[in-house]
């Protein structure tokens, strides 16, 4: 597991705060350390008076966020770990939704599971033509657990949202926009 300081890059350009999830070898999958770092980094930029807009992106060109880090989740057996795993993502997603600054997702590749749920929390999305979005948890027998089903239905045509949730299929950037 990477150290929190290694997994999240914070930069500022003029009045733009940029959060880069920095785990390209794992397709920027969200383990507990990354979730903790994301909570802290987002709060830092959200409370910075010099930052007027926040951009969230993923390192590398293959993935924005490929979802939760299943290897990390499965490496721990205690119920408290599962609760921490879920609580952290709910904290940051809710904070993104209620932020008084515009939050932009710059989706540069795969956005699966928690990655799709993360971009659904943002105000504006810029999605690369090669990006794929989806909620594949259903193929593992899991319902998306970070509010993605509720956000997707509010933001997409109901039939498209149901298709994604029931099949676990992926959609292209062109279909998503």
Predicted regions and their residues:
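Conserved CoA-thioester-binding segment of acyl-CoA-metabolizing enzymes
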Residues: 1-57, 94
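Crotonase-fold acyl-CoA enzyme core
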Residues: 2, 95-177
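Glycine-centered loop/turn positions within well-structured domains
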Residues: 25, 62, 71, 150, ...
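Phosphate-coordinating loops and pocket residues in cytosolic domains that bind phosphorylated ligands
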Residues: 29-32, 66, 75, 154, ...
């Amino acid at each position: 597991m990477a150290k929190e300081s290694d997994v999240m890059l914070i930069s500022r350009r003029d009045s733009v705060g940029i959060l880069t999830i920095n785990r390209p070898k794992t397709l920027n999958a969200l383990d507990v350390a990354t979730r903790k770092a994301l909570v802290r980094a987002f709060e830092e930029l959200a409370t910075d008076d010099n930052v007027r807009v926040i951009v969230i992106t993923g390192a590398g060109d293959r993935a924005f966020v490929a979802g939760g880090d299943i290897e990390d989740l499965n490496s721990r057996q205690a119920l408290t770990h599962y609760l921490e795993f879920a609580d952290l993502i709910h904290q940051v997603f809710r904070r993104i939704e209620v932020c008084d600054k515009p939050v932009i997702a710059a989706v540069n590749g795969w956005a699966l599971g928690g990655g799709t749920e993360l971009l659904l929390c943002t105000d504006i999305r810029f999605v690369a033509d090669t990006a794929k979005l989806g909620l594949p948890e259903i193929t593992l027998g899991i319902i998306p657990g970070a509010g993605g089903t509720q956000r997707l239905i509010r933001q997409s045509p109901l039939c498209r949202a149901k298709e994604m949730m029931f099949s676990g299929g992926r959609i292209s950037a062109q279909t998503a926009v």
